[in-house]
Amino acid sequence: MRVILAPMEGVLDSLVRELLSEVNDYDLCITEFLRVVDQLLPAKSFYRLCPELHNQSRTQSGTLVRIQLLGQYPEWLAENAARAVALGSYGVDLNCGCPSKLVNGSGGGATLLKDPELIYQGAKAMRAAVPAHLPVTVKIRLGWDSGDRQFEIADAVQQAGATELAVHGRTKEDGYQAERINWQAIGEIRQRLTIPVIANGEIWDYQSAQECMKVTGCDAVMLGRGALNVPNLSRVVKYNEPRMPWLEVVKLLQKYVQLEKQGDTGLYHVARIKQWLGYLRKEYTEATDLFGEIRALKNSKDIALAIQRINR
């Protein structure tokens, strides 16, 4: 089976990708989206989003990384897709699933699910702009407020020439409600298409991954929030390994704080450290105590000291 690390805006930046790829066996990582409007973005925008471009589009551990684009104008998606691969990205991905109100309000992400023709035009333009040996992939949800057009959407992706399709098994309106997950619909899409389909949504452990693959018939899964809850989730899913012990998680957090300090000591990264702890609290009770201790702290140095005290 293949296991792919999902794009998660505001969460899975290059530093988190680096750490997670060190302790996992991901076959591919997708970046946070790069927003495309009506211009060709400068190279620095691509390098900022995906510093792995300097390393043949791989993390330091060797995991492949693919840039994701978000936008609604086919010609500019194409121009920026061409630049992404020219700079070294291992193909490009088109975001047609982000449920953020801010993103949707500007015509990107899940808004495209309302207009399968626009998905077709965007993916087709990107495919034409990218060399044939490199993948052009698309990530969707089942629809905007229902799954009535899921086949039309999936057909648009395949007919555009996309290499493969990742399907999150909920509509935009479903958000992340666990009870709304629809793996069966992913399976119906997989049966309909000839290109590979990747299943995404509510995969938290080995058992749920096995059940998802059984229901969908997919041999590839994409992990999102669960990859932050359980830092070694790809190994749990692939090999039925136990989840990472808490003290190993602490070592990851210690390294993360140091990486963040090297990059930016501003409140942005402090917020991301706290954000990751928020995810860890769902699986590790110890994370709740640590979160309570650092919640009021304002700089990476103080947070690092708090985390270091755990091993003493």
UniProtKB/Swiss-Prot annotation:
Name of protein: tRNA-dihydrouridine(16) synthase
Primary enzyme class: oxidoreductase
Residues carrying the site annotation Interacts with tRNA: R35, N95, Y176, R272, K274, Y279, R295
Membrane-traversing stretches: none
Sequence positions that bind FMN: P7, M8, E9, Q68, K139, N200, G201, E202, G224, R225
Entry keyword set: Flavoprotein, FMN, NADP, Oxidoreductase, RNA-binding, tRNA processing, tRNA-binding
PANTHER family per the UniProt record, alphabetical: TRNA-DIHYDROURIDINE SYNTHASE (PTHR11082), TRNA-DIHYDROURIDINE(16) SYNTHASE (PTHR11082:SF26)
EC number: 1.3.1.-
Pfam families reported for this sequence: Dus (PF01207)
Cofactor(s) of this protein: FMN
Superkingdom classification of source: Bacteria
Organism: Yersinia pestis
Annotated family: Belongs to the Dus family. DusC subfamily.
Function summary: Catalyzes the synthesis of 5,6-dihydrouridine (D), a modified base found in the D-loop of most tRNAs, via the reduction of the C5-C6 double bond in target uridines. Specifically modifies U16 in tRNAs.
GO molecular function, one term: tRNA binding
Catalysed conversion reaction: 5,6-dihydrouridine(16) in tRNA + NADP(+) = uridine(16) in tRNA + NADPH + H(+); 5,6-dihydrouridine(16) in tRNA + NAD(+) = uridine(16) in tRNA + NADH + H(+)
